[in-house]
Amino acid sequence: MTAGRDPVAVAALQYCAAGTAEETLRTLMPLIDRAADDGAKLVCLPEAATFLAASRAALADEAEPAGESTVLDRLCNAAARRGIELSIGSMFFLKPDGRHVNRHLLVGADGRICAQYDKIHMFDADVGDGKSYRESHYFAPGDEMVRADSCGMNMGLTICYDLRFPHLYRRLARDGAEMLAIPAAFTFNSGKAHWHVLLRARAIETGCFVVAATQCGTHADGRRTYGHALIVSPWGEIMAEASTDDGNAAAGANDAVIHAALDPHAVTSARTAIPSLGTQPEFS
């Protein structure tokens, strides 16, 4: 139902996470304040929101145990201080078995954690940038889809590489999602070819808003991320977009906060015009 619901003021952040949380927070906290100052009620952070480690050993040193994160506490306090919801695109936590999880967290305006989602699809790929990515060597995959209320809209929580698996998003939409949070740290090579196409496709085929906060720049491990934080309408139109990294920009030059007002009525309108969610046959 959309009757009587007002548009939601959403911001998506773009920046280049450092190799440690402490250094990243010096960039991130002012961006959160900037988004709140500009009127955002929901602020979305990218994948690897607090750090992108230079090595597996550095990941082990920097990641905190789940449930004992002082860095997460600081972000929760920021949400409460500004009276905003935070979609923390992902943080890396240490599990008791020694493995890590890549976890997307939704924090309410009271600073409490409302929902959490562990990344299901591991990025094991070679995208032609001279690096080999094997997330399955570092992280334990999740196994549950997650939706949650965010500012009166139903949000589907996902992370980065999940974007390439459309069945996940159709299921989230059919179960009630109106907004899809797709935080990312897309590599430059794959982003240049696929980023816009994939995000707009997910919006069009689900009739959902897509909010994609993203990393942008060259990180401690040498990877270069694409940027272009995006907010996409249920009709597949780009509502807001940040710039990309040209490879030579000064540190912080590509940091950005983009904004859009998400009107729940646009979801109803798109799905009424093209009712594909309700007409797809089941295949055996």
What are these regions (language model features)?
Residues T2-V10, R147-G156, M179:
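Beta-strand-turn-beta hairpins that frame and shape the catalytic cleft
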Residues A21-E22, R26-D110, Q116, T187-C208:
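Cys-nucleophile CN-hydrolase/nitrilase-fold catalytic domain and related Cys-dependent amidase chemistry
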Residues A66-S87, N154, C160-I258:
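CN hydrolase (nitrilase-like) catalytic-core segments centered on the catalytic cysteine
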Residues I88-S90, R103-L106, V146-A148, A229-I231, ...:
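Short beta-strand scaffold segments in enzyme catalytic cores
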Residues V257-S284:
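Short, basic/aromatic-enriched C-terminal tail that caps enzymatic domains
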